[in-house]
């Protein structure tokens, strides 16, 4: 298992895996991931994309200056830590919107699978943050 976090440029340029009118089995796609981190663009609807993310452990502090993110947890326990010290804890079938410009980091408590809806070319800015 690997835990490679892509660069901001690689994240923004991730290609769409499935074209319209293709049925996608998200459970099978998630089960095929053996890495501790994988975030892939499954499909695109207009200017928004659906990402499937598998995460175990921490993702670095960052923000998306011009894109909100909507997270929907499918499996496991998922946390979003905010710069002000709050921690949002989500379980399967819970969702939250993180507004554009919000400094945060995500964490999979064990293996976590979530869906993320965001702008197709959402910019990611990694930031220094002292906890």
Model-derived regions: residue spans:
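A short, N-terminal "cap"/entry segment at the start of jelly-roll beta-barrel domains
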Residues: 1-51, 130-131
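Ligand-binding loop in jelly-roll beta-barrel domains
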Residues: 100-127
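Short, conserved beta-strand element in jelly-roll/cupin
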Residues: 54-55, 64-80, 117
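Conserved short histidine dyad/triad with adjacent acidic residue
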Residues: 35-36, 49-65
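Short acidic-glycine-tyrosine-enriched beta hairpin
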Residues: 84-100
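Short beta-strand segments in beta-sandwich/barrel cores
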Residues: 50, 59-61, 76-81, 95-96
């Amino acid at each position: 298992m690997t835990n490679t976090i892509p660069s901001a440029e690689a994240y923004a340029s991730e290609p769409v895996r499935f074209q319209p009118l293709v049925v996608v089995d998200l459970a099978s796609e998630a089960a095929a991931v053996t890495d501790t981190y994988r975030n892939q663009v499954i499909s695109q609807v207009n200017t928004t994309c659906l990402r499937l993310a598998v995460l175990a452990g921490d993702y670095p502090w960052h923000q998306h200056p011009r894109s909100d993110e909507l997270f929907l947890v499918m499996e496991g326990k998922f946390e979003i830590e905010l710069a002000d010290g709050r921690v949002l804890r989500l379980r399967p079938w819970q969702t939250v919107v993180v507004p554009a410009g919000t400094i945060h980091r995500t964490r999979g408590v064990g293996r976590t699978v979530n869906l993320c809806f965001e702008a197709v070319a959402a910019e990611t800015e990694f930031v220094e943050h002292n906890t």
